[in-house]
């Protein structure tokens, strides 16, 4: 679950926002990437190709009013198809049974420069609270 937290925080903070408004993430200019330990020796990097997110951000207060994201688990791509198939299997994401992972923000706190977003992350039908920094 730790690397999924990095995925979501990368999605949230990897694009610039300008005025108070509601946004849909532009998949051309953002990505949902991850890095995970492999055999405790190296890191495997990858991304999810299909996702969407809805954001309501207030530039004046530098705060998120709402944030939610849906990631298609079958769109995982590490550059090695055999590994991707394994990640889609019941051993990991169980993409056929659980095609989406979701994050829904519950609260956001900021000191003006950095922020912490608390919310619920759901993977394989299991929801856990996480804090993104």
Regions found by a protein language model. Name each.
Residues 2-10:
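Sec-dependent signal peptide recognition
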Residues 19-133:
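Low-complexity, acidic/polar, glycine-enriched regions of mature
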Residues 7, 15-22:
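Sec/Tat signal peptide C-region and signal peptidase I cleavage site
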């Amino acid at each position: 679950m730790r690397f999924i937290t990095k995925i979501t925080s990368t999605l949230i903070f990897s694009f610039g926002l300008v005025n108070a408004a509601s946004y849909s993430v532009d998949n051309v200019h953002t990505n949902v990437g991850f890095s995970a330990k492999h055999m405790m020796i190296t890191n495997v990097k990858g991304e999810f190709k299909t996702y969407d997110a809805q954001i309501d951000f207030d530039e004046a207060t530098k705060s998120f009013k709402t944030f939610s994201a849906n990631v298609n688990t079958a769109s995982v791509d590490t550059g090695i198809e055999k590994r991707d198939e394994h990640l889609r299997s019941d051993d990991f994401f169980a993409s056929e049974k659980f095609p989406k992972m979701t994050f829904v923000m519950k609260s956001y706190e900021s000191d003006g420069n950095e922020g912490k977003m608390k919310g619920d992350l759901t993977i394989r039908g299991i929801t856990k609270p996480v804090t993104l920094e």
